[in-house]
Each structure stands twice: as C-alpha cells, then as structure tokens.
Amino acid sequence: MNLRIATYNVHNTDGSRSIDGISHEIIKHKLDIVGLQEIDVGVLRSQRKNTLGEINKLCGYPSAVFSKSIDYDGGEYGIGALFKYPLVSMEKYMLPSVYEQRIIVKLVLDTECGYLSFFNTHLSYVSRESRKEQLKFIRSILSKEKKFILTGDFNIESFDELDVLSSIKTANNKTTPHNTFKAGGCIDNIIVSDNIKIKNVILSESEYSDHNMLVADISV
C-alpha cells in the first residue's frame, strides 16, 4: 500500500489567511495522513478559533483529532492530525518534560493493509538532554510496534540526536537534508519502521508558517 504522509508545524496560525493557506497546501499535496504541531484551540492569539477544525473545514478529511499538551492563554495548545482512515484507537503519552509538557500521540488506523500505528509528537527546544530523555521514552513505545509511522517537530540540533531510536528510516537525514525550519534547521521529520519503504521526499515551502511542510511517499 502506498501512502503520502506529511508533517507540518503550523506555528499557531495567524488568522484566516494562514488557515486558508495551510489548508490549500495540504489539499494540493493530496495527503493520506498529516501530523500537525503547534495547534491552538480557543486561544486568544488565534482569535479563540479551533484551528484544527478550521483547517479541516477546507480540507474535508473524514477524521481529525487534537491532543492537548498544555493549557494556554484561555484555551488549549497541542498537536493534531488529519487522516482519511477510520480511527480504531487513540492514546496520549506524557513525555518527560522539564519546562513545557510535551506529548506523543498514538493513533491506530484501519487501512487497506490492516491496522497501522501512526504517531505524532513535538519535542522540547530547551536542551539536547531533555530531548534525549524524550526520545528514550519514545523508543520504549516504538519497540512494541511491528510497523509504524512517526511525524513530528523534533527540535534537534543535529541528526545524531535521533540515533537514540533504532531500526528506523528517516525522510530528513544527513544524506538528504531538508531545511524545514526557515530560520535554519532540519528539525521536522517523518520516521518509519525499517520494514516501510520511503520512496520520495518533498519539501513544500510555505509562506504561512515559520516551518516548511515535509512530505514523504511511502510503501507500507
């Protein structure tokens, strides 16, 4: 089964123009699953909007899920996902965090090739050591999976931080680096178990966020 996956830090959005632009970018790439980071729900800076809901009003995915990391400015802030498959189950894990609470979310999706585990996360920017502990926790979760996809903003300073994980393939790596953070940094990634093939990777440059969207065509 071939899938088109993306990861996209949408930077909270800045109102209708940003929401429209992000939505049309997702539509343009005909994504099967997209993991989103920095999602606001009911937050003042985003005009109290449910930004994931607003994005999906235009995208029209049958399934959209939001997971709160923290309470923020009168609302909730976290990560989300849009996907075209039925949701079988969902589980949120609290990552070890020293400053701002970070999470990883597992979705089990009912696809043409059976149940598929999809994970989404947004790691700490505070320190390499903090991310190392978070990645160790993620490794313990992924070790139980036969086949998985993981999207996220990992906030890494160098690719070797991901060496904590094992038996994986990455869309963004030393051989084919993609500058997903506009200010400089290959910090966003799509990671798959080593029994999944990454066929093609696209960096979709965005004017609607401080990140570019990373897209990968994979074979499961």
Which role fits each region the language model picked out?
Residues 3, 32-33, 116, 147-149, ...:
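Short, Asp-centered acidic motifs that coordinate Mg2+ and/or phosphate
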Residues 14, 39-115, 202-206:
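Structured beta-strand-rich core segments of catalytic domains in phosphoester-bond hydrolases
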Residues 92-93, 108-111, 143-149, 154-220:
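Metal-dependent phosphoester-hydrolase catalytic domains
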Residues 8-10, 39, 121-123, 152-154, ...:
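Active-site metal-binding loops of divalent metal-dependent hydrolases
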Residues 1-58, 71-79, 136, 220:
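N-terminal, active-site-proximal structural segment of metallo-dependent hydrolase catalytic domains
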Residues 2-12, 91, 115-124:
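Active-site-proximal beta-strand elements of phosphoester/diester hydrolases
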Residues 12-15, 41-44, 72-74, 126-129, ...:
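Active-site environment of divalent metal-dependent phosphoester hydrolases
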